[in-house]
Amino acid sequence: MFYMLGKRRRMSRIMKNGRTVILPMDHGITKPEKGIEKVDRVVEEVQDYIDAVIVHKGVAKRSAVLADIDAALIIHLSASTSLAPDPNDKRIVTSVEKAIALGADAVSIHVNIGSKTEAEQIEKAGTISEICDDYGIPLLAMMYPRGSIDVTTETVRHAARIGYELGADILKVPYVQSFEEVVAVCDIPVVVAGGSKGSEHEFLKRVEDAIAKGAAGVAAGRNVFNSDHPVRIAKALHMIVHGNMHMEEVMEYEGNMVVG
């Protein structure tokens, strides 16, 4: 499937036995959420339970931790802010070449399907996927139905397929109950997004359900770094994704660790 040696080698750092736990900490440009100011501390604490970290270039070049951990480094290329007239208008703020210079194992982009600038975002994604092919570096595409489009099985399925058609190597999409229909439309790894911070119980149940329906893992940021117990949550994700454990088993193993 991944026909180039460079991509295959780098993908193996992200995907372990076909599964992955990714920690996105690229939220600081959008809005400085609680915990985002402690990237190094959070990554150092949870490093045993994650396979990859997503950050922007500014964080990567200043980090004292990212160069010394086993987790893969993914540099995020897209950005917009919550203060903008159109927060869904994602713009490219760095290059694949810069990401490689920073030591990236992969790059990621965010595409908002249904937004006013959907066409421009799709065009950029297509160009970036070709550059990634040239350098043998995997592309993770975060594909979201946004704007006036509701998050439904059909819209998420369509968004995922767009990312696949554009040349992405991994897809990150929102959770829907019929996640198996999303997975079925693409023969590349599809990871479920963690979503906004909420109940630990509900969050972990969503992840468990997505894994049971074919998800290749989870990319969860706010539910980890915004938690009062990030290590506990990261460990639970690792047990569900890599250990095929049910949430009830995780709770029993950890002594009813999930309280929310």
From Swiss-Prot:
Swiss-Prot/TrEMBL catalytic activity: 1-deoxy-D-threo-hexo-2,5-diulose 6-phosphate + L-aspartate 4-semialdehyde = 2,3-dioxopropyl phosphate + 2-amino-2,3,7-trideoxy-D-lyxo-hept-6-ulosonate
Biological process, per Gene Ontology: amino acid biosynthetic process; aromatic amino acid family biosynthetic process
Pfam families: DeoC (PF01791)
InterPro entries tied to this protein: ADH_synthase, Aldolase_TIM, DeoC/FbaB/LacD_aldolase, DeoC/FbaB_aldolase, FbaB-like
Top-level lineage group: Archaea
MF term (GO), any: transketolase or transaldolase activity
Keywords for this protein: Amino-acid biosynthesis, Aromatic amino acid biosynthesis, Schiff base, Transferase
PANTHER family from the UniProt entry: 3-HYDROXY-5-PHOSPHONOOXYPENTANE-2,4-DIONE THIOLASE, FRUCTOSE-BISPHOSPHATE ALDOLASE CLASS 1
HAMAP family cross-referenced by the UniProt entry: ADH_synthase
Binding, 1-deoxy-D-threo-hexo-2,5-diulose 6-phosphate: 26-30, 144-146, 194-195, 221-222
Keyword Amino-acid biosynthesis in record: yes
Stored SMART domains: DeoC (SM01133)
NCBIfam families: ADH_synth (TIGR01949), PRK07226.1 (NF005556)
Entry keyword annotation includes Transmembrane: no
Protein name: 2-amino-3,7-dideoxy-D-threo-hept-6-ulosonate synthase 1
Record note on quaternary structure: Homodecamer.
EC number: 2.2.1.10
Active-site residue list: 26, 144, 172
Organism: Archaeoglobus fulgidus (strain ATCC 49558 / DSM 4304 / JCM 9628 / NBRC 100126 / VC-16)
